């Protein structure tokens, strides 16, 4: 018998964060709403994921659906801002989130777009306990800084990755610069995101992320910095990893 999301193994989940995002779940697809910063960030994230996946799986990027036949897991999918474009690129997408409200919002929007995405309220630990996967690609984008046990969470994600697969992690660096700009500036000065969205103490340094996965049969690459240009209003790749960065994880 399959466990429900409420009784499944979920020791990495932070209930307070789940409740915080559930409260604003209806706004996921509003480009001017509380998730507006993610809408602006999304093109940069999508470009990085596509580039890394094309290289890892040696696919031709000229077609509309270069990733047909590959299974992708989007962990902490929220309203589906990444799940939908991944499905359009040909991936068979499974997308999970600890918030049932997020999943309902995501599933409704996908149905309106005519997209088939396997949405369900669940945790990474639940999927592993059920024997789900393995998946060719695992995404955990802007999620690890919101969980209670980042090490356990990342190791669980790595276990869901298939041999030959690719995992991409995006998060925030625990630096004074990130505290000033991503926490105080973004939440309390510019009001880009609701106050309390982030806890600076939960931001991860790249070396910490790497250490969490040291016992897994994976290789960790990066960090790859990304930065926001207030003059253009766009995100782009950067050598600066002091605030936002991404890392890739491969399993051979």
From Swiss-Prot:
Its EC number is 2.1.1.222, 2.1.1.64. SUPFAM superfamilies: S-adenosyl-L-methionine-dependent methyltransferases (SSF53335). It catalyses: a 3-demethylubiquinol + S-adenosyl-L-methionine = a ubiquinol + S-adenosyl-L-homocysteine + H(+); a 3-(all-trans-polyprenyl)benzene-1,2-diol + S-adenosyl-L-methionine = a 2-methoxy-6-(all-trans-polyprenyl)phenol + S-adenosyl-L-homocysteine + H(+). Keywords: Methyltransferase, S-adenosyl-L-methionine, Transferase, Ubiquinone biosynthesis. InterPro entries: SAM-dependent_MTases_sf, UbiG_MeTrfase. The keyword Methyltransferase applies. The keyword Magnesium does not apply. One of its GO terms (biological process) is methylation. S-adenosyl-L-methionine binds at residues 45, 76, 97, 141. GO terms for molecular function: 2-polyprenyl-6-hydroxyphenol methylase activity; 3-demethylubiquinol 3-O-methyltransferase activity; polyprenyldihydroxybenzoate methyltransferase activity. It is an enzyme of class 2 (transferase). It holds the Pfam family Methyltransf_23. Pathway: Cofactor biosynthesis; ubiquinone biosynthesis. PANTHER family: METHYLTRANSFERASE (PTHR43464), UBIQUINONE BIOSYNTHESIS O-METHYLTRANSFERASE, MITOCHONDRIAL (PTHR43464:SF19). NCBIfam families: UbiG. O-methyltransferase that catalyzes the 2 O-methylation steps in the ubiquinone biosynthetic pathway. HAMAP family: UbiG. Belongs to the methyltransferase superfamily. UbiG/COQ3 family. This is Ubiquinone biosynthesis O-methyltransferase. It comes from Caulobacter sp. (strain K31). The gene is ubiG.
